[in-house]
Structure formats: C-alpha cells, structure tokens
A protein has these predicted regions:
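Histidine/acidic-residue-rich, glycine-tolerant segments that coordinate divalent metal ions
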Residues: 71-72, 93-95, 99-111, 117-118, ...
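Acidic/His- and Gly-rich active-site-bordering loop/insert found
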Residues: 5-112, 117, 121-141
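Non-cysteine beta-strand/loop elements that form the S-adenosyl-L-methionine
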Residues: 85-87, 200, 359-365
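Metal-dependent amide/peptide-bond hydrolase catalytic core
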Residues: 2-9, 225-399
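Divalent metal-coordination and catalytic microenvironments
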Residues: 34, 73, 86, 116, ...
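Contiguous, non-catalytic segments that form substrate-binding/exosite surfaces or channel walls
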Residues: 39, 43, 152, 302
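Predominant activation on well-ordered alpha-helical scaffold segments within soluble catalytic domains
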Residues: 28, 49-52, 124-131, 158, ...
Length: 399
C-alpha cells in the first residue's frame, strides 16, 4: 500500500548517513540531556529550553508557550506551497528508572519510559537536516516542527490543536519508537492504528461492620470483588468477538484494618475501543453490570466515567505515502504494513481528527523492554534513522 498522497519518486540516498555524520552527536547528546531531567505533563519548561538551545541558529520562525511549554518552529522553503507538520512529544512518566544507564534519570520517580526523549531529539535532527541550504531551497512550502508537552494523559495534543497549531497545515506525521518491532523497521497502517482510551472510577457502597459478624454488614470488599469479575463479561459476552475491546480494572482499594468490614471500596480502570458506537455504549454497560451486582448483594455502585483520547485514525493515502517514503529511504525489507492496531492510545489522534496524516512506528528491537517499563533502553543508532525519515516525509511532500 503506497497510496496516492504524493508521488514517491525522490531519491533519498545518503540522507541518513549525512544526518549521522553532521548531526548525530548533537542528536544523541540532546537525547541524553533530556533523559537525565525528565519532566511530566505540561511542566516541560527545562525540556523546552534544551530544544530551543538545540535549534538555535537555524532559519526557523519559533513560537514558544504553545500549550504552556510547547514549541512550534516553522521552516519556510524557497517556493510557495503547503505546510507539512512533524510532531514529537516531550513529557516523561512517573516511573523509577532501572536501566543503569550512565545518563539515567537524575529525578527520583521520573523517567523517559516511553521514548519521548528520542522522539524530541529525532525531530530536532530533522530540523537541522532540512535547514541545510540545499534541502531548504528544494522545499515548496513550509515545515512545522511541533514539540508537544503532556502526551501522557494530559491531552497536550488537543490543546495544541485548540490553539491553532494545525490551522494552516495540509498534512502531519509523527514517529513512535516501538519495542517488539525489529530494529529500524518502519510500520504503519491505514485506518485505526491506536485505540480510544477511556477511564472510570467506581465507588462501591455497602454497610460496615465487625469482621467476625459479616451477616450484619454488606461487605464492600466482597461486592467489589464480584463487580470486578462481572465486568469481564462486558467484553467477553457483549462485544462481537471480532471487534477489539479491552476493559481492565487496574486499581482496587478498601479498608482500614484487618478485622473491620469497610462500608466503601474503590475501583479504577480503563476501557479501550476502536469502534465509536461501541465506545459510546460502554459506560452504560459498565454501570448497569456494576450496579446490578452491587444491588443484588445489598449495596450500590456509583460510576464516574471519563472519555479521554479518541481513536488514532491514519489517513489511507498518508499511511501509504509514509510507507513509500520509508521504502525509498531504507529499502523494502525495512517496511511493514501492519495488520492490526495496538490497543494503546495516543493524543496524536486529535491532530488526525483535523488534518490528514499518519502515526508511524519505528522499531527499536524485539528484545527491548516494553514501553512504560523501568527497564526501557534503546540503541541510540535509531535516532539518525528517525530523523532521516521525518525529514524525508516533509522533503518529498514539498519537493
């Protein structure tokens, strides 16, 4: 699937090698600097400062303070034409790092465990490459380099869109480093590639009592346990077996002492879907099952359900174009059209609701620890490769 987004015909021979030779050390140094000082959510001020320092001297129109600490840097080509956006996320996760790297996180309880330090440095590398006079002069249009805070649950992408970042953009692309995919492999697909991610909290109410006299109480712990079990039937018995859906209870809490039956218990979880109709149905079914079980055990359940990131849906032509550019850049053996989406989620979905584009996975190896784990570490040789792909996506589109 190569699509008809634009004709993929330009030769990119030597682009990755040039980036490695001219900017490789800068890209790696930036990645390590960001990795040492991970920042959470919208509070990415130091990371933004590092990015601005790395972009200093390039022929870019730079806007700061977008979505609080986001940056939009625009490179204008020699000729007129459309604007292509390339996006990277900058925030980290509240995880204690266990990689043992010499540039490990210096901040207790924080880590770049989703590769955003790599995404940011790769985009800086692409900005340096495209800012070289020969490549810049070949562009008919402009490239927006979008550095976004708060991907990890903060919805920074929505704020960027609401603040007008993509109003003049004709297409947009983003890369995500991906463990489990062979090193250097570029993978994407048309249509849904990442799921919608919604969240719920639930309070289970019973009546408390002495642990030795359960018959005089309505045990919220036992009710909660039965609710957790019953919720598993929402997907397994109410959703078409060929329709992807996930319902996970990830939090449960109750009680203050071993011999006291608590009157309340708390559950928290996530629901992932790819189908908008199913997504809209899920809150009602979660509440009905939970309350039905609780009432049958002399209790009740209150549900607080939050719709969060929508499905990440790649434009068909843009996805085909991205695979075509990657094939021309790295060879057919380095390209994979995905058969199935991931049930993880991405706030890049907000950009794709407004602008055609594609979210692309870049493999870091099949034996690399997974995303959101304290052991995540990847070979930094992937960084110039990612920079080359980002640069090529813009270069071909605007040539």
């Amino acid at each position: 699937m190569r699509g008809d987004f634009v004709d993929v015909s330009q030769s990119f021979e030597g682009l990755q090698a040039e980036i490695e030779e001219n900017f490789g050390e800068k890209i790696v140094a930036l990645r390590r600097d960001i990795h040492r000082e991970p920042e959470l959510g919208f509070d990415t001020e130091r990371t933004a400062e590092k990015v601005l320092t790395a972009l200093d001297g390039l022929p870019l129109d730079i806007e700061t303070g977008v979505a609080e600490n986001g940056i939009v840097a625009t490179l204008k080509g020699k000729g007129d034409g459309p604007t292509v956006a390339l996006r990277a996320d900058m925030d980290a996760l509240p995880i204690q790092e266990e990689t043992g790297l010499p540039f490990s996180s210096e901040i207790e309880g924080r880590m770049h465990a989703c590769g955003h330090d790599g995404h940011t440095s790769m985009l800086v590398g692409a900005a340096h490459a495209l800012s070289q006079e020969d490549l810049r002069d070949s562009l008919s249009g402009a490239v927006k380099f979008v550095f976004q805070p708060a991907e990890e649950g903060g919805g920074g992408g929505k704020v960027m869109v609401d603040e007008g970042v993509v109003e003049d953009v004709s297409s947009i692309f983003a890369l995500h480093l991906w463990p489990g995919l062979p090193f250097g492999k570029v993978a994407t697909k048309a249509g849904p590639i990442m799921a919608a991610a919604d969240a719920f909290e639930m309070e289970i109410r019973g009546s408390g009592g002495h642990g030795a006299m359960p018959h005089l109480a309505a045990d919220a712990v036992v009710i909660a346990a039965q609710v957790v079990t019953a919720l598993q039937t929402v997907v397994s018995r109410e959703v078409d077996p060929v329709e992807p859906a996930v319902l996970t209870v990830g939090e449960i809490g109750a009680g203050t002492a071993f011999n006291i039956i608590p009157e309340k218990a708390r559950l928290g979880g996530t629901v992932r879907t790819l189908n908008s109709n199913l997504r809209e149905r899920m809150p009602g079914r979660v509440e009905a099952v939970a309350r039905g079980v609780a009432k049958g055990m002399r209790g009740d359940a209150n549900l607080d359900y939050t719709f969060s990131y929508p499905v990440t849906v790649n434009d068909e032509s843009a996805a085909g174009y991205a695979l075509g550019v990657a094939e021309d850049l790295f060879g057919a053996h380095s390209v994979q059209e995905l058969s199935n989406p991931s049930m993880t989620a991405e706030d890049f979905s907000y950009y794709l609701e407004d602008v055609p584009g594609a979210f692309i996975w870049l493999g870091v190896g099949e034996d690399v620890s997974g995303l959101h784990t304290p052991q995540l570490a990847f070979d930094e040789e992937i960084l110039p490769r990612g920079s080359a792909l980002l640069a090529a996506l813009a270069l071909q589109s605007l040539s």
